[in-house]
Amino acid sequence: MVLRYKLPPGYPQPLTDIIGELVALSPAVVVRAPDGRVVQVSADQVVALKTLGARPVASREIRALELAAADAWPGTEQTWIDGWLLRYGDGFTRRANAAAPLGRAHRIGDLYSGETLERLRAWYAERGRALTLLLPDRLGTAPEGWTTGGETLVMAADIGNLTLPDGTSIVEVTDRPGPDWLASYHYRGALLPEPALAVLSAVRDGRVAFGAVRGGAETLAITRAAITDAPDDRRWVGLAAVEVAQAHRRRGLGFLICGEMIRWGRDRGATHTYVQVEEDNAGAIALYRALGFVDHHRYRYATAPTP
């Protein structure tokens, strides 16, 4: 937001502006500047209050966040081939079993020459998987004839701009998911396959934790959080596997557990937070917007045509 307001007598100019986050509209207009300053202006001194368009996200920022997210969900095996990061997770989740063009642009092999493509295919074939590409905005496009799908929205926030819970937390946080946590997580509506535990527990050069809200012997809500560093020196905490028990939905538990796990990350040095959510999951997107997340970029998957 940009706030223009009147200055008291004695200033050389009658008006001034401040750009920042709108904190409150009543009883006074309150704006928090990027440097943390909070400006409070009575309504009768406000000249204009205008929403600014979102700052465009640079390609380097997309690459940096994708690298941090890949370390937070690395699968069980990773390698680099011609500037492509390949992950393998024994088939559990698409993003843990896909190749992404996350190297520097001049180091990424030319898929359309066929040489790099064949190397990627061979690596996955050795592990019994077909090649799937994960293609973030502006970092890569699908080869001609390939099928794309699974459009995913990456949402992010500066933790300093969020209002997080304070006081004693009711969320139980552990380093590994226990049996109750695993029983509460239904990946794509089904019970977890055998490889899931290794993928859920994996993190590269970071820290992972599993949060749960309990009511007596019942697990009411769960989520996974992982802290990793991006090449631009931002420390991210990423949320995944957010689930609330069917009988306890629409009671604010999703909002609560996400806020608590972001706080867990902040207390361990995280400055930013992100989530990855399929674009047709309207309920989850609404939850994250309510928490303060904004759109960062999108990615999609590409698969080769069937011979």
Label each region the model flagged.
Residues G10-Q13, V23, V41-A125, G140:
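N-terminal charged segments
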Residues L85, Y112-L191, A302-T303:
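Acyl-donor-binding surface of acyltransferase catalytic domains
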Residues A100-D110, V242-R249, E278:
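A short, internal acetyl-CoA/4′-phosphopantetheine-binding micro-motif in the GNAT/acyltransferase core
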Residues Y112-R121, A240-Q246, R250-D267, H272, ...:
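Conserved acetyl-CoA-binding loop-helix of GNAT-fold acetyltransferases
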Residues R127-P136, G265-Q276:
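Conserved GNAT acetyl-CoA-binding A-motif
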Residues L134-L139, Q246, V275-I285, Y301-P307:
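Conserved beta-strand-loop-alpha-helix junction that forms the acyl-donor binding cleft
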Residues P143, Y288, F293:
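Conserved active-site tyrosine of GNAT-family acetyltransferases
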Residues P165-A240:
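Flexible, substrate/cofactor-facing loop regions flanked by secondary structure
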